[in-house]
Amino acid sequence: MIETYNQPSPRSAATGLPVRMKIFMYLLTIFLITQMIGSALFAVYLHRRLDKIEDERNLHEDFVFMKTIQRCNTGERSLSLLNCEEIKSQFEGFVKDIMLNKEEKKKENSFEMQKGDQNPQIAAHVISEASSKTTSVLQWAEKGYYTMSNNLVTLENGKQLTVKRQGLYYIYAQVTFCSNREASSQAPFIASLCLKSPGRFERILLRAANTHSSAKPCGQQSIHLGGVFELQPGASVFVNVTDPSQVSHGTGFTSFGLLKL
């Protein structure tokens, strides 16, 4: 009887090598990443620390400079034989520059204020007054949503806006009227924007007309006037109509105003 014996093959020593290599590479990667993060944090810390040291050094230099000026003013002499005259001249020049900058800023602010005073905003907006039904020159009142910016424009006698500053003005008027009332004549309803200058005759700046209507009830119609004109100090503007009894004085119907450009 022949017996066969199979000898087991020896275990390869290289089977554990890949596992060890993976562990080594993993640890090496973690080490490199940690080192990179640590280096970045250290760089940030070092940069901030250097900035802080630089600020402290500048403050120290300023402190030394001020102490040196104090010693020069008191007549003391340091061991380094500092040139007090040169240091004083540098300090005086520095202070002079600061004062000049302040003076320039003050002049700029003063110029802006003077410019605002020279060109103030002038505006006015007034509302019609019902008492103007008996006169061809419409009357106005400072009521409701009115505007009177300052004393450079005034409402005189309730009839005219007078300006005290020369310039270009946008002047406007809106007149609303009832067109089917019994009119004294068959002539169209006419609204005129007029100017009265000091020492001159009155003259018409703008004029608009609208025909009467037979519609009932009362048919409200509006006339709009507006334009840009050069006004002299003391000039007055007013609104004239052919039939004041037809003018509507309800809220927002009839108004008058100007604005300096």
Curated annotation (Swiss-Prot):
GO terms for molecular function: CD40 receptor binding; cytokine activity; integrin binding; protein serine/threonine kinase activator activity; tumor necrosis factor receptor binding. Keywords: Cell membrane, Cytokine, Disulfide bond, Glycoprotein, Membrane, Secreted, Signal-anchor, Transmembrane, Transmembrane helix. PROSITE patterns: THD_1, THD_2. GO terms for cellular component: cell surface; external side of plasma membrane; extracellular space; Golgi apparatus. Residues 44-261 are extracellular. One of its GO terms (biological process) is positive regulation of NF-kappaB transcription factor activity. It holds the Pfam family TNF. The soluble form derives from the membrane form by proteolytic processing. The chain crosses the membrane at residues 23-43. The keyword Methyltransferase does not apply. It is a single-pass type II membrane protein. Cytokine that acts as a ligand to CD40/TNFRSF5. Costimulates T-cell proliferation and cytokine production. Its cross-linking on T-cells generates a costimulatory signal which enhances the production of IL4 and IL10 in conjunction with the TCR/CD3 ligation and CD28 costimulation. Induces the activation of NF-kappa-B. Induces the activation of kinases MAPK8 and PAK2 in T-cells. Mediates B-cell proliferation in the absence of co-stimulus as well as IgE production in the presence of IL4. Involved in immunoglobulin class switching. Belongs to the tumor necrosis factor family. This is CD40 ligand. The gene is CD40LG.
